[in-house]
């Protein structure tokens, strides 16, 4: 919509980082190219942010503060008056320390401010004919590690490879997460897909061992957003 109103006076910005799968960047580049949207890619290194690799409960705050600081600097250097991001009303329902950084930096959240939920955004996207209307929700790869478990480049790569293998396995998984608990990979898929993954347990386990996991487990509760926040004490969510 910004592109329709402003043309090249609006620019889409994507970060390139070890915490985001390469396929996410490729999809962003392809989408902007197909829509004729001006697009910039900024290289970031979240593992160099002080405190990030230790994976504290406010890791997302540290990350958002750094990344959006870079984007704001880009905007100021190139004459853009505002920076927008895509949070929606549903994001209020989970622990989101990154939202504090967004507010502190003065970044605007127009979809959230308009009171739009994820389902409503998908419906509007369908009306506009956007290919992203059915795109599964996604969070950065750092969100696959329990708080307090150190995040490393090797660990991020291991998770990315495991998730990509599941997507390419022919299991027809539209949504999934591989949570890294030390040497154990905990696989989350929607409840309706659990039996299908379990039927190929030996193949999945063998693949995950190739990626460096000693064990592969299937979460019987199924996929849910922010599952690693479930054990976070209430006082840590503030």
PLM regions with names:
Residues 1-127, 185, 203-213, 218, ...:
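ATP-dependent adenylation/nucleotidyltransferase module used to activate substrates
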Residues 11, 180-191:
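Short, aliphatic-rich beta-strand segments
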Residues 117-123, 130-139, 172-174:
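Short, structured loop/turn "capping" segments at alpha-beta junctions
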Residues 135-153:
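Internal, active-site/partner-interface "lid" segment
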Residues 154-174, 202:
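Short amphipathic alpha-helix segments
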Residues 172-177, 215-217:
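A short linear hydrophobic-aromatic micro-motif
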Residues 193-203:
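Short, conserved charged micro-motifs
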Residues 226-238:
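Short, low-order "capping/linker" segments at domain edges
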């Amino acid at each position: 919509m910004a592109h329709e109103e402003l043309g090249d006076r609006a620019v889409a910005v994507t970060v390139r980082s070890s915490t985001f799968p390469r396929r996410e960047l490729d999809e962003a580049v392809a989408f902007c190219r197909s829509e004729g949207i001006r697009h910039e890619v900024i290289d970031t290194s979240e593992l160099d942010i002080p405190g990030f690799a230790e994976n504290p409960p406010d890791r997302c705050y540290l990350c958002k503060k750094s990344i959006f600081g870079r984007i704001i600097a880009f905007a100021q250097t190139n004459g853009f008056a505002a920076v927008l991001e895509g949070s929606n009303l549903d994001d209020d329902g989970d622990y989101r320390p990154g939202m504090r950084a967004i507010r502190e930096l003065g970044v605007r959240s127009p979809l959230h401010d308009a009171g739009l939920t994820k389902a409503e955004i998908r419906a509007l996207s369908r009306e506009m004919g956007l290919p992203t209307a059915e795109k599964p929700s996604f969070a950065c790869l750092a969100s696959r590690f329990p708080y307090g478990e150190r995040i490393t480049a090797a660990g991020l790569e291991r998770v990315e490879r495991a998730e990509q293998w599941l997507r390419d396995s022919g299991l027809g998984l539209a949504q999934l997460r591989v949570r890294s608990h030390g040497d154990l990979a905990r696989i989350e898929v929607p409840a309706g897909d659990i039996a299908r993954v379990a039927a190929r347990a030996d193949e999945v386990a063998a693949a995950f061992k190739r990626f460096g996991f000693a064990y592969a487990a299937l979460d019987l509760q199924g996929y849910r957003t922010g599952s690693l926040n479930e054990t976070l004490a209430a006082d840590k969510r503030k």
